[in-house]
């Protein structure tokens, strides 16, 4: 099993300490997702983390920080949909349809597909995929399910 955490959209007091603790206790990868954060804010946050964890962090914003801090890579999304010119590192992407997965998965190390579950933070943002749809997409080789449960039926 891989433990991957996506940060909350806003910085919070004690976040660097919490992230450090997560890494110390088995976190494999952190997706640093701070929409609207400046390069300075993101850099200040990264400077609070031990350097040994930088190669396990993927940034969703301020892609130039990937090379400055030696981050694992970048994550493409609706706000930042293009790989920067000349970038050769790790790339992941958010996809919101199986068609998007098919279009982008060959250009990425991996993709996130959502919404799989009803959102607890976005009102009215409901699951877009039945278990059957996901299983068929897996059988067709479109996606790789990391976790399935019959309890969801």
Predicted features by range, described:
Residues 1-75, 79-81, 91-108:
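Conserved N-terminal beta1-alpha1 strand-loop-helix module at the mouth
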Residues 38-39, 123-128:
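Glycine-rich tight-turn/loop motif centered on a GG-T
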Residues 42, 46, 113, 130-134:
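A general structural signal for well-ordered alpha-helical segments in protein cores
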Residues 49-56, 92-94, 128-145:
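Alpha-helix-loop-beta-strand connector modules within alpha/beta enzyme cores
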Residues 85-87:
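Short, conserved loop/helix-junction motifs that constitute active-site signature segments
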Residues 109-117:
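Non-cysteine beta-strand/loop elements that form the S-adenosyl-L-methionine
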Residues 117-123:
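A short acidic, helix-capping loop that chelates divalent metal ions and anchors anionic groups
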Residues 147-153:
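Conserved small/polar residues in nucleotide/adenosyl-binding loops
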């Amino acid at each position: 099993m891989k433990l991957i955490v996506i940060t909350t959209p806003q910085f919070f007091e004690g976040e660097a300490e919490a992230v450090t603790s997560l890494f110390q206790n088995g976190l494999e990868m952190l997706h640093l997702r701070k929409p609207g954060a400046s390069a300075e804010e993101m850099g200040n946050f990264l400077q609070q983390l031990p350097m040994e964890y930088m190669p396990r962090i993927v940034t969703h914003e301020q892609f130039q920080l990937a090379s400055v801090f030696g981050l694992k890579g970048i994550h493409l999304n609706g706000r930042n949909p293009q790989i920067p010119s000349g970038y050769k590192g790790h790339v992941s992407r958010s996809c919101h349809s199986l068609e998007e997965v098919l279009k982008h998965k060959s250009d990425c190390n991996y993709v996130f597909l959502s919404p799989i579950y009803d959102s607890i933070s976005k009102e009215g943002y409901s699951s877009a995929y039945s278990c059957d749809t996901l299983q068929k997409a897996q059988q067709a080789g479109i996606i790789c399910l990391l976790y399935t449960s019959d309890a969801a039926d």
